[in-house]
């Protein structure tokens, strides 16, 4: 075998050692990796990382003192809402395998590992008594990341609200959550902030508010009867109330960090937002306005208050008194409440103007736009195994340019970007590892992102999603987002997909 092939298989060899998988297969052809497009073209201080989240990967859901989150309850009470009726009780068992997983991240040549802290692992009831074993676990994870020469990029809230707070006051439907979130953040900053310099308060508040309260497909599973199969909820108001309290929770935690910790810990804090980019369905003025309005509703809903202290005018006009208002004090608290913005980007949709309706209101009628990846039956880009994800890498350039032009060119980290494949246990692992679609997805998005940087967008890092196959929320274990294959049928053994080897080559490891 040639030296170059041996070089390519260093990761596979490591995986064989740390996961006990024996001799790795060597069917990967080196031509897959022959590329002049690599890390060296990006700014010297640019971070390349990979991500995960607590409920998706940790497992160990009811051991070592962790309290239940709303996702534990949701998957238990509504298994019919999960595609394969599963839960994150085991995930990818990161709780017991974090050392070997972090070693793989290092071996790939990445700079940083993004993960989230389970609020109910630290505070089993959301507040009050601290769980020392939970505190110890994250100390161990952070220390292991640093010991491997990696940078921890840590999210405080990735959708797994402690069930106790949902029971006590309906969670983010109540403004009481703001103080509890601030206290949780305070403890985490105090405990880990000597080593963690990149903090994300919230991951995708849009998804939490929309899927949890508009359609009811995410925990806590609330929506109007006309919008989905939910016992309780109001799709016309609750998503906006929840979003408002998420924004205020972020702002409170960010202010706390900046006033109490930042000067001596010398870290940065931000929030991670998610959006599609939107192209007008036609060149008509109405469709151009609809595309702009859709971006306001998906992205500006959070980016506008965090930057300017108020909601986008298009939302105010559409929603009237259904949209909560910020007090003068809240405007000051929220405005400019970040050092950076994280952005999760996967796809771009068309937006076509639609009339505003006053019956059976939902987020999607409020937008006054029909949003779809299809135009006259033709997709905006190649379809994938995930029904909403169509490949459109140009959108990442358009999005970071939009942030530069509309939101004062903030420091940006792409905190998620990736593609899923359907889980198919009937094909051999040697075949399942061949994920050419993922290689081309990352390669093309990075090319458009680099162009965005050259055009002046202040992007400082790119985190692929995700490290390993894991629990994909309402899709359960039916989809694989990882660059590392997890064998759910054989003790969760890890195998590198071709994308992991491509990434290693891209990173000049």
Swiss-Prot record:
Q: Name one Pfam family in it.
A: Glyco_hydro_1
Keyword field: Disulfide bond, Glycoprotein, Glycosidase, Hydrolase, Signal
Catalytic activity annotation: (R)-vicianin + H2O = vicianose + mandelonitrile
Glycosylation (residues): 38, 360, 424
What are the boundaries of the signal sequence? 1-19
Which molecular function terms from Gene Ontology are attached?
hydrolase activity, hydrolyzing O-glycosyl compounds; vicianin beta-glucosidase activity
Q: Which cysteines are joined by disulfide bonds?
A: 223-230
Tell me its EC number(s), please.
3.2.1.119
- Report the active site residues: 204 (proton donor), 416 (nucleophile)
Tell me, which GO biological process terms does this entry list? carbohydrate catabolic process
Q: In which tissues is it expressed?
A: Expressed at high levels in seeds, at moderate levels in flowers and at low levels in roots, stems and leaves.
Protein residues bound to a beta-D-glucoside = 56, 158, 203-204, 346, 416, 465, 472-473, 481
Q: Which SUPFAM superfamilies match?
A: (Trans)glycosidases
Enzyme class (EC, first level): hydrolase
Tell me the PANTHER family matching this sequence.
GLYCOSYL HYDROLASE, VICIANIN HYDROLASE-LIKE
Can you tell me which family this protein belongs to? Belongs to the glycosyl hydrolase 1 family.
Function as written in the Swiss-Prot or TrEMBL entry: Hydrolyzes the disaccharide glycosides vicianin, pNP beta-primeveroside, 2-phenylethyl beta-primeveroside and furcatin.
Q: What is this protein called?
A: Vicianin hydrolase
């Amino acid at each position: 075998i040639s030296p170059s092939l041996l070089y390519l298989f260093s990761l596979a060899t490591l995986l064989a050692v740390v996961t006990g998988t024996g001799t790795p297969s060597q069917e990967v052809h080196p031509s897959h990796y022959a590329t002049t497009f690599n890390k060296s073209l990006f700014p010297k201080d640019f971070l390349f990382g990979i991500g995960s989240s607590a409920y998706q990967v940790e497992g160990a859901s009811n051991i070592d003192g962790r309290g239940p989150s709303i996702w534990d309850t949701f998957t238990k009470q509504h298994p019919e809402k999960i595609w394969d009726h599963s839960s994150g009780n085991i995930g990818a068992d990161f709780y017991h395998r974090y050392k070997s997983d972090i070693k793989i991240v290092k071996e790939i040549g990445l700079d940083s590992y993004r993960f989230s802290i389970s609020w109910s692992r630290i505070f089993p009831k959301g507040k009050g008594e601290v769980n020392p074993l939970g505190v110890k676990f994250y100390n161990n994870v952070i220390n292991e990341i640093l010991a491997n020469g990696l940078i921890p990029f840590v999210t405080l809230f990735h959708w797994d609200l402690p069930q106790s707070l949902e029971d006590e006051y309906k969670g983010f439907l109540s403004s009481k959550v703001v103080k509890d979130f601030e206290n949780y953040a305070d403890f985490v900053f105090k405990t880990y902030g000597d080593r963690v310099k990149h903090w994300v308060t919230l991951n995708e508040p849009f998804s939490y508010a929309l899927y949890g309260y508009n359609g009811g497909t995410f925990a806590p599973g609330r929506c109007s009867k006309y919008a989905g199969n939910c016992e309780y909820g109001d799709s016309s108001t609750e998503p906006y109330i929840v979003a408002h309290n998420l924004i205020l929770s972020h702002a409170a935690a960010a202010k706390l960090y900046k006033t109490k910790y930042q000067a001596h810990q010398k870290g940065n804090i931000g929030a991670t937002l998610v959006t599609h980019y939107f192209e007008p369905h036609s060149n008509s003025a109405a469709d151009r306005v609809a595309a702009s309005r859709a971006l306001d509703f998906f992205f500006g809903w959070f980016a506008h208050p965090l930057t300017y202290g108020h909601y986008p005018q298009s939302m105010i006009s559409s929603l009237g008194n259904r949209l909560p208002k910020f007090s003068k004090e809240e405007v000051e608290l929220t405005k400019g409440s970040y050092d950076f913005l994280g952005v999760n980007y996967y796809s771009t949709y068309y937006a076509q103007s639609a009339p505003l309706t006053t019956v059976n209101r939902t987020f999607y009628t409020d937008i006054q736009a029909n949003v779809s990846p299809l135009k006259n039956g033709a997709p905006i880009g190649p379809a994938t195994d995930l029904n909403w994800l169509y490949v459109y890498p140009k959108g990442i350039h358009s999005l970071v340019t939009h942030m530069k032009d509309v939101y004062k060119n903030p420091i940006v980290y792409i905190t998620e970007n990736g593609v899923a494949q359907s889980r198919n246990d009937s094909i051999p692992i040697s075949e399942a590892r061949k994920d050419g679609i993922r290689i081309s997805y990352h390669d093309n998005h990075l090319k458009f992102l680099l162009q965005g940087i050259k055009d002046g967008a202040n992007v400082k890092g790119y985190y692929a999603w995700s490290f390993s196959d894991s629990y994909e929320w309402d899709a359960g274990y039916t989809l694989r987002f990882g660059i590392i294959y997890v064998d759910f049928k054989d003790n969760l053994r890890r195998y590198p997909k071709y994308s992991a080897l491509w990434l290693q080559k891209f990173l000049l490891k």
